């Protein structure tokens, strides 16, 4: 009876492992589809194959990752920084344009604070340093150089680094 119990216990553990593997594969497939949806959204927005840095993060607490996209290249960057896009993630894995900000650079943070249901962002803008971008009900402000300087500690609990400082 003991050998039968050990045999049955051994059989019981195998499906658990298969379930875990299946769940991991489903997550990988979901993430791949999400990345493809983001790539299509960025290409549709830029009308080309622009280079960019991106981070998926749920900015509006709806359980669906949104995308923060920092474009690069001569057509998207100037002396003050580059164009930053925020795309709202949709349940079907696609992304819709949400906000466009100019003169933005890294580091970019999602702050612990929120305005009208969206996390406040902090971006670096040349000449000012880190500034706070608050959602106004429709979008984030388009010109960070006109935003309020962020004076608190960026590394405080609740703030999330989305895009670290990059070599330009």
Regions found by a protein language model. Give the residues of each.
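Acidic/hydrophobic-patterned starts of short beta strands in beta-sheet-rich repeat architectures
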Residues: 61-72, 115-123
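Repetitive beta-architecture junctions, highlighting loop-to-beta-strand starts
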Residues: 52, 82-84, 128
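Acidic, divalent-cation-chelating loop motifs in proteins
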Residues: 55-62, 111-112
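Acidic, small-residue rich beta-repeat scaffolds with periodic aromatic anchors
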Residues: 3-29, 109-168
């Amino acid at each position: 009876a003991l050998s039968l119990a050990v045999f049955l216990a051994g059989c019981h553990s195998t499906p658990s492992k298969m379930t875990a593997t299946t769940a991991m594969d489903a997550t990988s497939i979901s993430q791949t589809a999400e990345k493809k949806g983001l790539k299509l959204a960025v290409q549709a927005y830029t009308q080309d194959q622009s280079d960019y840095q991106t981070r998926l993060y749920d900015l509006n607490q709806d359980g669906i990752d949104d995308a923060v996209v920092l474009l690069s290249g001569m057509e998207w960057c100037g002396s003050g920084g580059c164009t930053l896009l925020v795309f709202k993630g949709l349940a079907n894995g696609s992304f819709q344009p949400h906000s466009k900000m100019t003169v933005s650079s890294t580091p970019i943070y999602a702050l612990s604070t929120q305005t009208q249901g969206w996390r406040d962002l902090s971006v670096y803008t040349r000449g000012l340093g880190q500034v706070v971008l608050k959602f106004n009900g429709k979008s984030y402000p388009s010109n960070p150089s006109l935003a309020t300087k962020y004076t608190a500690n960026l590394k405080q609990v609740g703030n999330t680094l989305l895009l670290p400082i990059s070599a330009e």
